[in-house]
């Protein structure tokens, strides 16, 4: 009988610790959610720095590399913007006859559509 009481006491202590840990994780998550605007601003600033590298005098390959970086930056951030750079990159790669970037942007498009639920 003593063993059962000890086991119940230990079990209740472990459950209490588990609930405390779960609440601590939720509090930490709430802190991250509260700082959402800061994270969005930081991400947008990073994207703006990449966009600022675009110049009219760039070669097609240089422009394609930047479109690729913009896709990567937008991929988990904004679906529509990521798709814009996939389409721009695909069109430029096709007109420049660059098979590497044609394939690369096809893969990006498939990945983007599949992860957003637009697959068939």
Where are these regions (language model features)?
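N-terminal secretory signal peptides that target proteins for export/translocation
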Residues: 1-3
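A "functional boundary" signal
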Residues: 5-8, 16-120
